Amino acid sequence: MAETAAESGGGGDSGVGACERGVAPIKAQYRTTKERFHEYLDGDKQEGACQEVPTGDPAEPGAKRIRLEDGQENGKTEVAIESRERQVPKRARGQNKSRPHVKPAHYDKDRLCPSFLQEPATPCAFGDRCRFLHDVGRYLETKPADLGPRCVLFETFGRCPFSMTCRFAGAHLGPEGQNLVQEEVVARCAQLPSVRNGLDRALQQQLRKRQVCFERAEQALNRLTQSPMPTVVPETTVAMATPKQNSCHAQLDTVGGAGTPQSSPVPTCGPLTDEDVIRLRPCEKKRLDISGKLYLAPLTTCGNLPFRRICKRFGADVTCGEMAVCTNLLQGQMSEWALLKRHPCEDIFGVQLEGAFPDTMTKCAELLNRTIDVDFVDINVGCPIDLVYKKGGGCALMNRSAKFQQIVRGVNGVLDVPLTVKMRTGVQERVSLAHRLLPELRDWGVALVTLHGRSREQRYTRLADWPYIEQCAKVASPMPLFGNGDILSFEDANCAMQTGVAGIMVARGALLKPWLFTEIKEQRHWDISSSERLDILRDFTHYGLEHWGSDTQGVERTRRFLLEWLSFLCRYVPVGLLERPPQRINERPPYYLGRDYLETLMASQQAADWIRISEMLLGPVPPGFVFLPKHKANAYK
């Protein structure tokens, strides 16, 4: 069944008639029209609960703007809008590539110098050249009002590191403006494990100055270029590249050169272990035994640490960080290293790397192997976006077998943890490649492969091909293969497990309903209430403030990721409203009125209504606030 986009308003069905093909079967007493849906939401607005704010719609291309809005902008009638829609031969879908990019720092122009937040305060290293405010009185005069009486950081950790810049500062500032500390809570938190895998400042400087030695990576790359690599399939010939062709010139150099890999020019001290001089054999590596476990997919943008904490709470067994670009990690970019952070609740955790060159991928793998704590490293061979594909990464590696083999062998040669691969069925819709690559991946040393049952061309315009995944699971044996695609209920999970896969990966299903993991483990449908869903969002904002901070930048960054998640959550249809549970992932919800106002508000697919929900949790948005979701649904017809 084809899956296409439907993003307007609160759904795509404009009538109350019988269920159509591709439309979620909602009970007749709840179905409504587009006009009644928005009249209900606008009529029941609580006075003063939310102010009207621009949502960024005018900055979007006109073809999309017609679909996003109610059809009443600037006083134009519905007939006029429909005539304009007929002039568009094909409606826009996919990503909002031309959306405005507003950083959280934009809303915090008068920032206080960080030196004032140190305890005790330290002199500013920049002096008169500092671009931040040094006048505390002036800062407090211009600072917006607090967003609430409680500070999550102060209550959780006993001390808020943002002091007077916190948007909830009233909860922990003394009568003289001093930052209060709860010594007992601080002492208790000191005994608990903290978030791991941060980037050390000293290491960041070494990376930026290219002073990091990649001895094991150089040795692994030399082995790849000097010895012929065996081919697993006789019909396939792997073309060997010369060392010059095999290198990416814009990457880091090693200290001392590659001519003397046996000895490092950097003096070392301390105990010498076997792992320092003897490379682990594949049979000696740590095993990755996750068969039968629920695997949360590495989700770009939405798969952040606060969201993973939510999914862990509902029963996810395995988590993986968002896709990290290896060249950005080698350059010491803080934003990229933030994707590798691991919360203590993530007991089985991995990171996903994306790259197109064996040298940069191997060096990055060695760097992560000795600096962060993970249970496995995953190579992204499934990313379909043009920015990655045209550079030879993501799905493009499936057509670059020589480079793909060098990357897998090189990365696997420097890791002490298992190596996994996430891939698609292929690049083109009618040309499947996975069944040919899986035996090779098994012999290259890959511990586990996750297969998304769609090609790059298909994106989400087709249902996942689970019969093909079943075929690939047999070909890959004894290497475990996880299946991914269209899991939105425990029935879907049960059917997927019957194909012979070792386990299932959940992606969009977790975005629509993170309690899906509980449903699968308890084998039931959870008719969750709107108040329970709001509590989940409240917990997400608390986790977000812990992770990104409680100052203006942290609050707005938390709001942004909350809104991105709401662009998926709005597609969930409550179980009690369905005629025939469960909801299918390729069925779009029609316009419906929920069992209470909040349930109806959560069903709206307008950015303005998502902002209203965010204001319930994070207070009013700053002046000039703009938001457009990164992803638009193209999975409905």
UniProtKB/Swiss-Prot annotation:
GO terms for molecular function: flavin adenine dinucleotide binding; mRNA dihydrouridine synthase activity; tRNA-dihydrouridine47 synthase activity; zinc ion binding. It is an enzyme of class 1 (oxidoreductase). It comes from the Eukaryota. FMN binds at P298, L299, T300, Q352, K422, H452, N484, G485, D486, A507, R508. A zinc finger (C3H1-type) spans 107-137, 145-175. CDD domains: DUS_like_FMN. Transmembrane segments: none annotated. This is tRNA-dihydrouridine(47) synthase [NAD(P)(+)]-like. PANTHER family: TRNA-DIHYDROURIDINE(47) SYNTHASE [NAD(P)(+)]-LIKE. It comes from Mus musculus. Its EC number is 1.3.1.89, 1.3.1.-. InterPro entries: Aldolase_TIM, DUS-like_FMN-bd, tRNA_hU_synthase_CS, Znf-CCCH_4, Znf_CCCH.
